């Protein structure tokens, strides 16, 4: 298997975005966001389809570079009928719930990017990529983070964010939404005005707030990220409080 560093993946992501920008429908535009469906279909020649991938909703995307059947589930939860979907090596299968009204579009877009990146790495490294996965031929994306114990999946997850949120797009979108060249604090309680701008920016870019905040931090465009815990700014740990007393 090919071992790629974060810098290697940034280089690959840059090459993919450069090729995307040369597509006739994109060429000449100042890129502010990536249409991940268009990139997937027009640049990579992949097809996106939808099905119910698991009974508990944990599995949200899958793909394969070969012909193989995968189990899918009926829309009616009471049905016991076995169903299979035949992947053709060029199809990305996304959980159908991600297309429902009110679903997290950022999660859906990231899943498309994630599954696309399996194909990108296979195209770039056909003799190295996928050969260490104990014969695995189907790649799955899960709703919850299962950790980075799988090096192959870490590379795909990292590249997926880089392609969905390339540096030039993030910088231009920050300018568009009045966040300047660097966001000092992301905190919905103590910096609500900037938080609303950030929220609008994430929606505009088709990304989840979590993915965008992590990407901005990686790029040095966000100094402090309190997205998951806005009160961490003022919280005093019990041990520290005991020392004071």
Question: For the regions a protein language model found, what residue spans apply to each?
Answer:
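Active-site hotspot residues in diverse enzymes, especially metal/ion-binding acidic/histidine motifs
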Residues: 1-245
């Amino acid at each position: 298997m090919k071992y790629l560093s974060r810098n290697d993946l940034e280089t690959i992501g840059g090459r993919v975005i450069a090729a995307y920008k040369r597509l006739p429908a994109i060429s000449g535009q100042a890129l502010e966001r990536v249409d991940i469906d268009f990139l997937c279909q027009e640049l990579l020649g992949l097809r996106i389809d939808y099905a119910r991938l698991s009974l508990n909703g944990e599995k949200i995307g899958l793909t394969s570079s070969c012909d193989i059947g995968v189990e899918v589930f009926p829309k009616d939860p009471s049905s016991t009928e076995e169903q299979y979907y035949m992947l053709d090596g060029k199809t990305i299968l996304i959980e159908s719930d991600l297309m429902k009204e009110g679903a997290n579009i950022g999660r859906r877009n990231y899943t498309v990017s994630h599954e696309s990146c399996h194909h990108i790495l296979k195209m770039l490294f056909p003799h190295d990529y996928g050969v260490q996965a104990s014969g695995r031929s189907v790649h799955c994306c899960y709703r919850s983070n299962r950790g980075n114990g799988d090096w192959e999946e870490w590379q795909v997850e990292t590249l997926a964010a880089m392609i969905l949120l390339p540096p030039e797009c993030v910088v231009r979108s920050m300018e568009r939404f009045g966040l300047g060249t660097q966001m000092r604090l992301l905190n919905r309680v103590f910096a609500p005005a900037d938080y609303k701008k950030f929220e609008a920016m994430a929606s505009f870019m088709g990304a989840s707030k979590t993915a965008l905040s992590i990407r901005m931090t990686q790029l040095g465009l966000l100094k402090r990220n309190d997205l998951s815990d806005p009160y961490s700014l003022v919280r005093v740990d019990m041990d520290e409080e005991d020392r004071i007393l």
